Amino acid sequence: MSPTAMSLTTTTSRLPICRAQGGGVAKEKRTTPPPAKITPPSSSSSEAAGLSRRRLLQSAGLGLGLGLTAARPARAEATAPEEVTSNRMSYSRFLEYLDAGAVKKVDFFENGTVAVAEVDDAAALSRVHRVKVQLPGLPAELVRKLRDKGVDFAAHPVEPSAGVMLLDLLVNFGFPLLFVASLLWRSPTMNNPGGGPSLPFGLGKSKAKFQMEPKTGVTFDDVAGVDEAKQDFQEIVQFLKFPEKFTAVGARTPKGVLLVGPPGTGKTLLAKAIAGEAGVPFFSLSGSEFIEMFVGVGASRVRDLFDRAKASAPCLVFIDEIDAVGRQRGAGIGGGNDEREQTLNQLLTEMDGFGGGDGGVVVIAATNRPEILDAALLRPGRFDRRVSVGLPDVRGREEILLVHGANKRLDPGVSLAVVAMRTPGFSGADLANLMNEAAILAGRRGKDRITVSEIDDSIDRIVAGLEGTSMTDGKSKMLVAYHEIGHAVCATLTAGHDEVQKVTLIPRGQARGLTWFLPGEEDPALVSRQQIFAGIVGGLGGRAAEEVVFGEPEVTTGAAGDLQQVTRVARRMVTAFGMSEIGPWALAEPAAQGGDVVLRMLARSSMSERLAADIDAAVRTIVDEAYEVAKAHVRRNRAAIDQLVDVLMEKETLGGDEFRAILSEHVDIGKERRETAARTQQLATA
């Protein structure tokens, strides 16, 4: 039943039919309801009257729009006449009258759910009177029975109502327009008296965290292992504290400093240090905080950020992960209309555009993906300095360990210099995590000091994962032992490889066994062809031991990770380092080497199919030569390998010194290295 009919029924159901004594039917008496009492406004309503027009429009637009939309009025339907619907009859009694032939005429309303029938009632004073019957729909049996009884019946269709149509139009169009008008009215006049960002609800406001006197708790003394970057930042601090010292000779303050480096190398830590040392207002935010779902928000937030920064100049603005907003234009799906590109254009203008100037605002940005940044963002005048914060070397790692170990109780036997040598490729964050894991492990074991054992176990856990359950004696354990000893022997007997630090059968992560090497003191940025080839030989040593000892049918999938790493290194030798018979060519596309998916898709290979086939052949030649060298090591030193496997099966962990002592009983390691180098040279020149 529609709301209209429902209200009608409620009103008329209580009106009885009366008959006058004179024999005529009396008119229905209607009682006029008393007028609604008007309650004077309370104190709360007077307070509501004092609300601003902004809140009033917002409440009206949202409340009325949503409320009326949720309760949309139904279409007006034809209803039973009011004067004939006051007498009701149940459906079952109506059927009894119909079976008795006392029903003369039936009119159906409201899609067959209500019927007004003329009934011949002998018991009533008026033999024929009209009653209202509520029907359960319009059953087919009822229609058939009406036809059989010869009853005259008719259905009254829905009649449109002008009032309801007007209300529908108001709900569909009026309130949304009122809501939009309220937004347009309040945005420029109420929130933007200064002519700044004019987006509603503060969407155009920058989310940068502002600190007038930054108290980050970090100084340059807390930053270790990045001396070159510290020196550049200390100059920035001098620029901000004593600008007259540099302006006297015509120098200007650098507008921007871009920190580039892998994750965890201390870029954000450097920004915290300069904020704590400079003593000037500091704004900090992430590159992702510029972009929202609304168009124009990013550019508006950039304008607001620099307006606030210029008002507080001299000051620092730190944008972390700037690649979220500063990536190369034209690479996105949206092209030049992309919201990110509009934000970047506004950032370029604010830093050094027609409206930009030397306002004493220094922008510091950090990213670990400099290859995807827009070229216009990297030019001098915007980011005058580009500081590389790379992975620390041995000395840098030792300095970082000293900083993070200052508040920890270390055993006198712990040498941080040795720990630094054992952690090549560790970033500052990795080293901090290492010292924390060692402290947790010492507390778990009930020790009051961190010993070498906790340091070693923490390194293994960070690099390889959690320690698993030891394998039971059997063929699988023996196969893993031969595999790991094969790695260690082939690496030790090949010139240019690092020394073995330990060999273990204790599972960690997905690995059933591990062989650790201790890097030398050479510069890791300068690696020779001999060292790379030795690494490939050592990587294939496990597979070679499986094939020589157990036969080719017994080779397992345990070397899958080794093969992936070996193939990747060999391909880089050919395409990036020019260490093959193809020649000293750079055959790798820089864009294809990056991590950005869009740039990799857009990068076009400039090599022919024949050159690609030559590259594959050169990679295969390098891997095949290294595999033959590894199998030769295993065949010539089978007795030493068998003894080493027996010791490893018994102890499960074999130290580097003990390993070399047992191997030296069977072979002259130095002589074997020289002979291997000579054979490798012959293969390379053949």
Swiss-Prot record:
The keyword Protease applies. PROSITE patterns: AAA (PS00674), TAT (PS51318). Its EC number is 3.4.24.-. GO terms for molecular function: ATP binding; ATP hydrolysis activity; ATP-dependent peptidase activity; metalloendopeptidase activity; zinc ion binding. It is a single-pass membrane protein. It is found in: Plastid, Chloroplast thylakoid membrane. Residues 1-75 form a transit peptide. GO terms for cellular component: chloroplast thylakoid membrane. InterPro entries: AAA+_ATPase, AAA_lid_3, ATPase_AAA_core, ATPase_AAA_CS, FtsH, P-loop_NTPase, Pept_M41_FtsH_extracell, Peptidase_M41. Its cofactor is Zn(2+). Signal peptide: none annotated. The keyword Phosphoprotein does not apply. It is an enzyme of class 3 (hydrolase). Binds 1 zinc ion per subunit. ATP binds at residues 261-268. Its main location: plastid. One of its GO terms (biological process) is proteolysis. Residues 1-52 are annotated as: Disordered. SUPFAM superfamilies: FtsH protease domain-like, P-loop containing nucleoside triphosphate hydrolases. Residues 39-52 have a biased composition (Low complexity). Residues 1-14 have a biased composition (Polar residues). Gene3D superfamilies: 1.10.8.60, 3.30.720.210, P-loop containing nucleotide triphosphate hydrolases, Peptidase M41. The chain crosses the membrane at residues 164-184. Keywords: ATP-binding, Chloroplast, Hydrolase, Membrane, Metal-binding, Metalloprotease, Nucleotide-binding, Plastid, Protease, Thylakoid, Transit peptide, Transmembrane, Transmembrane helix, Zinc. Probable ATP-dependent zinc metallopeptidase. This is ATP-dependent zinc metalloprotease FTSH 6, chloroplastic. It comes from Oryza sativa subsp. japonica. The gene is FTSH6.
